[in-house]
Amino acid sequence: YNTGDVCVSLLKESGNTMIAHFIFKPNSRNFWHYHPDAEQTLLVLDGEGYYQEEGGEKRVIRKGDVIVTPPNVRHWNGATPGSSIVCMTVTEHAIENHAVQLRAVTDKEYDR
């Protein structure tokens, strides 16, 4: 459920916690998605990327940024055209399917 070159490593998935490490190469991003009844924390470890919640403006995120996405909020994130981004997510979830994938982020949405 990604567009472009994305490397995902699952670091922990036991109990109600999932920790994942992502490397998004330039121009890559995940799909619009949300986490049912679960908050997600995204930590930017390196590089530069984008983050957007449905109905909000796309914003630039950089190394050191921490983004907390409330439960059930549709969102996406990925790299900028000129930079990779490395990030880690921590999601506390109470159900098996921790993310509901919606649709690809269009080029028009990405380029806005």
Named regions from a protein language model:
Residues 55-72:
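Short acidic-glycine-tyrosine-enriched beta hairpin
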Residues 68, 82-101:
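A short hydrophobic beta-strand segment most commonly corresponding to one strand
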Residues 78-80:
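Asparagine-centered strand-capping/turn motif at beta-strand->loop junctions
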Residues 1-18, 31, 98-112:
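A short, N-terminal "cap"/entry segment at the start of jelly-roll beta-barrel domains
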Residues 23-25, 34-51, 90-92:
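Short, conserved beta-strand element in jelly-roll/cupin
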Residues 48-50, 74, 84:
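Structural motif
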Residues 21, 41, 56-59:
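Short, surface-exposed secondary-structure edge patches
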